[in-house]
Amino acid sequence: MLAGLRPPPSSGAPRRFRRPLVPVIVAAALVAVVAGIVIFRGHSGSTAASGTTPSTVSQDARRQAAVGLSGLLAQSVTDRAAVNEAAVDLRGCGPSLRQDARTLARAASSRQRLLSRLGSLPGRSLLPAAMLQDLTSAWQASAQVDTDLAGWADDMITRGCHGKSRSDAHLRASYAPESQATVGKRAFASLWNPLARRYGLPTYQRNQL
């Protein structure tokens, strides 16, 4: 039969209606909300069960970073004591000039190692940035002072001092970095000591570092 001659569809055939989509969308949204609530409660419950909160974890990590820094400071105190002893002997043209030169050279190397460890200190981002910068500046200057004083000791060994120390280029070169180190250590101590007291760690004066 030709297409144009097809009889019209029977009026008795059942009609198909599309179901409205709104209830389906609303139901899907409700399912998503319920699932989100369940997940959130589960997460909150697991956090409560473990007894930790983000702030607690942050405080613990900050304390660990402070403990790590305290260990570096203890090494610095040991170095400073050895440097002071060598400097006293040098100023008096003492009997241990060669040992003084070695002590000062070792102290300079130790400062550099401390700087490297400070730069990679775990959790350093949790400590005050200004405090770490003050300590970095102070240790850099102290390393330069130790190097200059070691050179001064070598000069006295070579030229002799005859019971009295003599100023030379190496000694004069140490003056500027020594002042810089003093400023940095004082600023560092003012920030470190309150933090150390909070965590029960040793406090320091600038002349100990």
Model-derived regions: residue spans:
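Low-complexity, Pro/Ser/Thr/Gly/Ala-rich intrinsically disordered linkers and tails that serve as
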Residues: 1-4
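Hydrophobic single-pass membrane-targeting/anchoring helices
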Residues: 6-54
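Short intrinsically disordered, low-complexity segments
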Residues: 36-39, 52-56, 80, 109-113
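Generic low-polarity alpha-helical segments
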Residues: 42, 56, 123-125
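Short extracytoplasmic/periplasmic juxtamembrane "stem" segments immediately C-terminal to an N-terminal membrane anchor
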Residues: 48-70
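Alpha-helical segments in soluble extracytoplasmic regions
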Residues: 64-153, 163-209
